[in-house]
C-alpha cells in the first residue's frame, strides 16, 4: 500500500513538473507585438500595400482606436474594422454577415481589440489561425460618423488602411519585405525621432520609450512555431491521465468498502465444548440419534452479529436443535 501511494505521488509530481516546464516554455516563446493604432495618420500603412505582419503562433497583437482628450490633435476618426478574405481585401468590400472586430465610435476612451494567434481557441467565438496562411483586416469606413457603416471603398481604398497577417511565416523568405514593412518587431523608420511610427497621433508618446527592431532570439521562431499546440496536446493528455488515476482510486476505495461490509469480520467455528449435554434414553444402546442442543451464540459471541444487537429485545436466547447421528468425539461426554 505504501509503495503504491509513493508511486502515485511520483506520477503526480512528474505531471505537474512537466506542465510547469511547458507553461514556461510557451510563455517565453510568445511575443506581444507592437500595437497598431487604427487611424489615417499611421505611416505604417504603405500606399498600395497596407501593413504587413509576420506573427507566429502564440503571439498577441492589439489594434487600438485612440481616444480624444485635451492633449489630442485633430478630430476623432470613426471606423469599423473587419477580418475578411483575400478577395474582399483586394476589392475593399465587406459583406453583411461580416462581424466587426472593432467599432471605433467612442471618442472619450480607447477602443482595443486583442488578437491572440492560436490554432485552437477555448472561446466559441474566438479567432483561430493556421500556420502558413494569410489573414486580412480592413476598414471600409471613411473616418466620419456618417460613413461609419460603408460597405465598400473607404480608407481601405483611399489610404490603404488594411493589414496582411502572414501567420507562421518567416519574413526573410519574403525578400525585402523586412525593409519595406514591419514584421514581428517593426523596425524604426527614419524621421520618427526614435519613436515607433504606429504611435497614435492623438496621444503624445513617452519620449523615453523606443522599440528595438533588431532584438535577438527570433531566428528560431519558425522552428518552434507550433509549441503552443504541442503544449495543449501534452497538457490535455496529462489531465486525462490524472482523471483516469483519480477514477481508478475512487473505484478501488468503493470496492474495498463494499467488500468489508459483506465479508465476515472473523472466521468462527463452533466449539463442541459449548454444546449442551445430549439427551439419551435408557434403551437406545448407542443406536438411536442423539438430541444435541447447539446454542445460536458461540463462545466468542461473534457468530451472529445481528443477534448480538437485538437479542436482548426479544427475551430469552433462542437455541437451534439439530438432529445428529450418534458419535463419540473426545470432548463430548455422556451420562452413565
UniProtKB/Swiss-Prot annotation:
Residue(s) carrying Phosphoserine: 263
Compartment list: Cell membrane; Cell junction, Adherens junction
Gene Ontology biological-process annotations: adherens junction organization; animal organ morphogenesis; blood vessel morphogenesis; cell adhesion; cell differentiation; cell migration involved in sprouting angiogenesis; cellular response to lipopolysaccharide; ephrin receptor signaling pathway
Transmembrane region(s): 233-253
Phosphothreonine: modified positions: 277
Pfam families attached to this UniProt entry: Ephrin (PF00812)
Expression tissues: Expressed in inner and outer pillar cells of the organ of Corti (at protein level). Expressed on lateral floor plate cells, specifically on commissural axon segments that have passed through the floor plate. Expressed in cells of the retinal ganglion cell layer during retinal axon guidance to the optic disk. Expressed in myogenic progenitor cells.
Presence of the UniProt keyword Cell cycle in the record: no
SUPFAM superfamilies noted in UniProt: Cupredoxins
Main location class: membrane
Sorted UniProt keywords: Angiogenesis, Cell junction, Cell membrane, Developmental protein, Differentiation, Disulfide bond, Glycoprotein, Membrane, Methylation, Neurogenesis, Phosphoprotein, Signal, Transmembrane, Transmembrane helix
Keyword Amino-acid biosynthesis: no
GO molecular function: ephrin receptor binding; signaling receptor binding
Glycosylation (residues): 39, 142
Recorded GO CC terms: adherens junction; dendrite; glutamatergic synapse; plasma membrane; postsynaptic density membrane; presynaptic membrane; Schaffer collateral - CA1 synapse
Motif, PDZ-binding: chain positions: 334-336
Extracellular membrane side: 29-232
Modification(s) after translation: Inducible phosphorylation of tyrosine residues in the cytoplasmic domain.
The family this protein is said to belong to: Belongs to the ephrin family.
Function: Cell surface transmembrane ligand for Eph receptors, a family of receptor tyrosine kinases which are crucial for migration, repulsion and adhesion during neuronal, vascular and epithelial development. Binds promiscuously Eph receptors residing on adjacent cells, leading to contact-dependent bidirectional signaling into neighboring cells. The signaling pathway downstream of the receptor is referred to as forward signaling while the signaling pathway downstream of the ephrin ligand is referred to as reverse signaling. Binds to receptor tyrosine kinase including EPHA4, EPHA3 and EPHB4.
Protein name as annotated: Ephrin-B2
Lineage start: Eukaryota, Metazoa, Chordata, Craniata, Vertebrata
